[in-house]
């Protein structure tokens, strides 16, 4: 099982690193001779995606091929894949199976002690230690320069199991450290280098430090091909941003993987905070004001700190498996690892490989003019408090629309003209005022028409991935069930080595298949994004709009039919029972029907069972026929609109688009009561932690216990809030545009946003007291202040951290009253006004006079 780990284009060669069948690493240079295609009249066995004949045109070098593309671009003459790394992988690695345990991954972290955080673009201060975990060796290598004392293994606070795997290399000087580390790096050159925030700091700093101390030749020796690319740009905030590319080594910043693939927003992305929320484990704490003092005064804990930093990233991946996810996507698409982080390249390669197998030729990448197109439909909610809410959502809406309408570049027939806005046109289709005479053509709501006699490339590919995901989900479930059965057997009969091994293997296989299904899910969800990206090979603005327009039609169409049915059953006229709709979902007010049938008087499972039956009836009698009728009305290729019941909620409220809360009794058949809160401050990472907790409880009381209980809670919560630690009531933001909003002395200027003021005040105090400053773009926590000797009304500090000891006196000036009003009462008032609740007891004339 030979598999590539890196392929780089350098000059006329493709420079490849690969692992052979026995697990040994190799390098080779290949003088690749690419093939492109041009149209012809004769039959050759090759056709473009439109069915026209093509013949191959071979080139001796990649340079010649690139030159030919450039020279003929204006004539639209040349066809084929112009990314020769993708074509080479496709030629050589037809079966891309891999074994993660054979791919060498380095997890690194560097320390550069200084009073202020040094810029990676200049690397001005020495590197005093480097931590490096090698997954093949399963060891932590730590290179360090002692300061006040030596690092002693027996004095370490690191866990014993980590110490057993730690190899400490003592160095006398920075040059010795860098020379020894370079020797080690070249002996065990990783295929992948990862770590936390290494793209912005560690890797550019290491590269620039080697350049500063030893020159470019030594710097380039970090690359197995002797070539390191360094680029520096200036961002919108005037900061120099340095990016490096060590050719032959893929850089996968774990911070970037976490942001891209976990689909959660955090108030802070500091490793310390992420480690705590994901692993319940933090960095090693230190008392010093900055890293320089930490290094100089406590070298023992300084090295322990480094080991723990590397270990946190290692443990995060053991839990999240984002490295496996990324590598799986890379090999599935047939691209380099780091290319997975791009928006369009994975699908570009997937479609190319699929068409190549059928001797179909992709069009050449063209420059497209971007444009705006209709977005998703969001129905304005019926603001207020509601009972008996059922929601239904469409399965994989945008991918399903692509399949239903057969949307693809080569299936386009044309676009029907229409008067007025697209929104008006969709409404007319819903009203039955527009007809589509040609049965042989599939239609979307924006007038686009597609062939039905051939299946489009895009629908075919998304269907393949869809079914692969389904198969992997099934396998993951089977192995998970197997693990449950083995665990039950061990509980009943006792554990044996054989059963334990079988259990671990089942869990391992379940995780692998789960990662594979997640990889497919990511691909499915990303295709529509690629389709609407002007840099995508198969981009067409009309197709992108055809998808969203049909999505709007699908929701409006079914809402019409649900309303017709409920009005008939409940004997009402023109009542809108669809409380809200958003992209692929509708939220329906079933309370009048539940009242008619007496279901609203039931409790517990009796209520939920009967309510579920009502929704099942609506699915069967209304929704399914509705989408079958839509498919026939629009003459689409095949029906792919399938809507399932999602939540059953006894109560709920809506206050604006994308802002609502539901007391869910059942979610897709799973009886696990919980609150579903969307868009309200409880869900915002900027909301203080204690306010998130307080608002969530207030919402629970509103939905489950009523106004009196809410008033009782708010009265007691105010006392809890004002007695809480300041970190619990701090609100989170980002320190952006600090240079823009400050003068040459670092003072806030005119129009400076409040949170930026707080960061600038903090940095002024940092200069005075010698602790680390807040950097541009950092996540910060902010608190309001009462009168103080500095005359400032707020202070920021690094999110997830605390105020430095030197300015801890400001804790006594935290303005709890203002924070309480602004961060708790203000959002609670917005909810209360919308649902006509009073969050505090008011005295009326009637109550006053008894």
UniProtKB/Swiss-Prot annotation:
Catalytic activity from the UniProt record: DNA(n) + a 2'-deoxyribonucleoside 5'-triphosphate = DNA(n+1) + diphosphate
TM region positions: none
Entry domain remark: The N-terminus contains the 3'-5' exonuclease activity. The C-terminus contains the polymerase activity and is involved in binding to the polymerase clamp protein. A beta hairpin structure is necessary for the proofreading function of the polymerase.
The protein's name: DNA-directed DNA polymerase
Cofactor dependency: Mg(2+)
Record Pfam families: DNA_pol_B, DNA_pol_B_exo1
Oligomer status and interactors: Part of the replicase complex that includes the DNA polymerase, the polymerase clamp, the clamp loader complex, the single-stranded DNA binding protein, and the primase/helicase. Interacts with the polymerase clamp; this interaction constitutes the polymerase holoenzyme.
Ligand binding (Mg(2+) 1): 109, 111, 309
SUPFAM superfamilies xrefs: DNA/RNA polymerases, Ribonuclease H-like
Residue segments, region Interaction with the polymerase clamp: 845-850
Residues that bind Mg(2+) 2: 202, 309
Residues engaged in binding substrate: 396-398, 469, 521
Gene3D superfamilies per UniProt: 1.20.1280.300, DNA Polymerase, chain B, domain 1, DnaQ-like 3'-5' exonuclease, Helix hairpin bin, Palm domain of DNA polymerase, Ribonuclease H-like superfamily/Ribonuclease H
Binding-site residues, Mg(2+) 3: 393, 584
Species per Swiss-Prot/TrEMBL record: Vibrio phage KVP40 (isolate Vibrio parahaemolyticus/Japan/Matsuzaki/1991) (KVP40)
């Amino acid at each position: 099982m030979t598999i590539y780990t890196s392929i780089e284009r350098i000059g006329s060669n493709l420079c490849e690193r690969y692992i052979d069948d026995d697990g040994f690493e190799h390098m080779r240079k290949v003088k690749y001779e690419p093939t492109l295609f041009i149209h012809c009249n004769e039959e050759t066995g090759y056709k473009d995606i439109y069915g026209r004949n093509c013949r191959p045109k071979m080139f001796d070098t990649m340079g010649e091929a690139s030159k030919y593309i450039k020279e003929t671009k204006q004539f639209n003459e040349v066809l084929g894949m112009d990314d020769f790394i993708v074509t080479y992988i496709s030629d050589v690695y037809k079966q891309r199976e891999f074994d993660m345990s054979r791919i060498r991954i380095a997890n690194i972290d560097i320390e550069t002690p200084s009073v202020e955080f040094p810029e990676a673009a200049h690397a001005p201060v020495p590197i005093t230690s480097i931590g490096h975990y090698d997954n093949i060796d399963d060891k932590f290598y730590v290179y360090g320069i002692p300061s006040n004392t030596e690092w002693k293994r027996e004095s370490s606070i690191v866990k014993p199991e980590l110490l057993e795997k730690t190899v400490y290399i003592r160095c006398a000087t920075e040059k010795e450290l860098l020379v020894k580390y370079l020797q080690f790096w070249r002996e065990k050159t990783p295929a992948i280098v990862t770590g936390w925030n290494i793209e912005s700091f560690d890797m550019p700093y290491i590269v620039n430090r080697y350049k500063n101390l030893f020159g470019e030749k030594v710097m380039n020796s970090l690359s197995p091909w002797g070539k390191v690319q360094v680029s520096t740009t200036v961002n919108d905030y005037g900061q120099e941003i340095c990016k490096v590319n060590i050719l032959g080594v893929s850089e996968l910043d774990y911070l970037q993987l976490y942001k891209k693939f976990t689909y959660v927003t955090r108030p802070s992305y500091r490793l310390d905070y992420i480690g705590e929320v994901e692993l319940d484990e933090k960095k090693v704490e230190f008392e010093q004001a900055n890293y320089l003092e930490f290094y100089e005064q406590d070298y023992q804990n300084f090295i322990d700190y480094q080991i723990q930093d590397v270990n946190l990233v290692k443990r995060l991946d053991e839990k999240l498996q984002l490295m496996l996810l990324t590598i799986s996507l890379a090999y599935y698409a047939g691209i380099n690892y780091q290319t997975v982080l791009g928006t369009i390249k994975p699908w570009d390669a997937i479609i190319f490989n699929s068409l190549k197998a059928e001797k179909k030729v992709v069009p050449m990448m063209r420059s497209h003019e971007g444009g705006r197109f209709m977005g998703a439909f969001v129905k304005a909610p019926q603001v207020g408090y509601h009972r008996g809410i059922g929601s239904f959502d469409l399965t994989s809406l945008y991918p399903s629309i692509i399949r239903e309408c057969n949307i693809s570049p080569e299936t386009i027939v044309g676009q029907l003209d229409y008067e007025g806005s697209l929104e008006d046109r969709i409404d007319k289709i819903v009203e039955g005022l527009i007809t589509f005479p040609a049965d042989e053509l599939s239609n979307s709501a924006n007038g686009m028409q597609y062939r039905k006699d051939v299946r489009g490339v895009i629908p075919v590919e998304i269907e393949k991935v869809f079914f692969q995901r389904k198969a992997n989900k099934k396998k993951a479930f089977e192995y998970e069930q197997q693990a449950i059965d083995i665990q039950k057997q061990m509980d009943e009969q006792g554990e044996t080595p054989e059963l334990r091994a079988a259990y671990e293997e089942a869990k391992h296989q379940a995780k692998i298949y789960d990662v594979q299904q997640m990889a497919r899910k990511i691909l499915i969800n990303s295709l529509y994004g690629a389709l609407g990206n002007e840099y995508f090979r198969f981009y067409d603005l009309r197709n992108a709009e055809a998808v969203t327009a049909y999505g709007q039609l699908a929701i409006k169409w079914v809402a019409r039919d649900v309303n017709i049915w409920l009005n008939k059953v409940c004997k009402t006229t023109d009542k809108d029972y669809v409380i809200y709709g958003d992209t692929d979902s509708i939220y329906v007010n079933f309370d009048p029907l539940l009242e008619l049938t007496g279901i609203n008087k039931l409790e517990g499972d009796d209520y939920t069972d009967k309510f579920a039956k009502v929704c099942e009836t609506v699915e069967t009698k209304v929704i399914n026929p509705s989408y079958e009728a839509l498919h026939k009305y629009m003459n689409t290729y095949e029906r792919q609109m399938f809507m399932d019941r999602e939540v059953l909620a006894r109560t709920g409220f809506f206050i604006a688009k994308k802002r609502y809360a539901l007391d869910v009794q059942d979610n897709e058949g799973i009886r696990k009561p919980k609150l579903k809160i969307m868009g309200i401050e409880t869900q915002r990472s900027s909301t203080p932690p204690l306010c998130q907790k307080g608002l969530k409880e207030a919402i629970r009381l509103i939905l489950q216990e009523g106004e009196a209980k809410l008033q009782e809670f708010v009265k007691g919560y105010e006392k809890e809030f004002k007695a809480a630690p300041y970190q619990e009531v701090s609100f989170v933001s980002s320190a952006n545009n600090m240079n823009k909003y400050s003068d040459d002395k670092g003072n806030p200027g005119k129009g400076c946003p409040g949170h930026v003021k707080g960061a600038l005040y903090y940095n002024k105090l940092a200069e005075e007291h010698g602790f680390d400053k807040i950097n541009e773009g950092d996540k910060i926590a902010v608190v309001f202040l009462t009168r103080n000797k500095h005359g400032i009304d707020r202070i920021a500090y690094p999110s997830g951290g605390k105020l430095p000891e030197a300015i801890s006196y400001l804790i006594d000036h935290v303005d709890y009253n203002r924070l309480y009003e602004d961060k708790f009462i203000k959002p609670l008032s917005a909810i209360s006004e919308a649902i006509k609740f009073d969050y505090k007891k008011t005295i009326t004339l009637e109550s006053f006079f008894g």
